């Protein structure tokens, strides 16, 4: 199996998969990774309760770029509807990180632009803990993410508690 890549170069095609690729195992996750997955699932359930069937959690995608085949799985997508003309891509992290920006913009963005060519994308890192050393464009509430007047391509939402 080839090494994971976070940057796509020369994307040729991309498609959504019905299931997780067979060769990707489901190991028993422990520690900080488990805590991160629990946080992601909480965020996904919260967003599904608000936005229903427009929410896609854990969708796998296959793509081919100059380096060959690759696979990726954005945490959460919220599809456009009558009141919202953009696709929202959410990456959940326990702690704010620059890695999320790279993942969202150089891995997920090219794949999703290929699959949804007529739709604008908004990328959001949802975090449980902030890093005071990172300069972040913060959004105050989940409602601000969906506000048509606030134009942005990438931002961070601090969601410690879901109440």
List where the protein language model places each region.
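Phosphate/oxyanion-binding active-site loops and adjacent basic polyanion-contact surfaces
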Residues: 35-40, 68-69, 99-104
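Hydrophobic beta-strand residues in large extracellular and virion-surface proteins
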Residues: 40-43, 47, 55, 75-78, ...
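Short coil/turn segments at secondary-structure junctions
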Residues: 26-31, 69, 91-92
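Domain-level recognition of nuclease-like catalytic cores that cleave nucleotide substrates
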Residues: 2-14, 119-163
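Interdomain/boundary linker segments immediately adjacent to catalytic/signaling cores
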Residues: 1-51
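Nucleic-acid nuclease catalytic cores
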Residues: 88, 93-102, 106-144
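Active-site metal-binding core of divalent-cation-utilizing nuclease and nuclease-like domains
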Residues: 31-32, 46-84
């Amino acid at each position: 199996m080839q090494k994971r890549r976070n940057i796509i170069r020369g994307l040729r095609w991309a498609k959504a998969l019905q299931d997780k690729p067979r060769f990707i195992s489901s190991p028993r996750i422990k520690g900080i990774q488990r805590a991160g997955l629990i946080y992601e699932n909480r965020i996904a359930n919260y967003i599904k309760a608000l936005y229903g069937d427009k929410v896609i959690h854990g969708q796998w995608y296959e793509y081919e770029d100059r380096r060959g085949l690759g696979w990726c799985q954005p945490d959460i997508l919220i599809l456009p509807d009558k009141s919202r003309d953009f696709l929202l891509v959410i990456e959940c992290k326990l702690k704010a990180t620059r890695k999320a920006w790279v993942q969202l913009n150089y891995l997920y963005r090219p794949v999703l632009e290929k699959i949804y060519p007529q739709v604008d994308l908004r990328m959001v890192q949802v975090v449980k803990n902030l890093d005071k050393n990172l300069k972040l464009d913060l959004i105050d509430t989940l409602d601000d993410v969906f506000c048509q007047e606030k134009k942005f391509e990438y931002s961070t939402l601090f969601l410690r508690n879901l109440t």
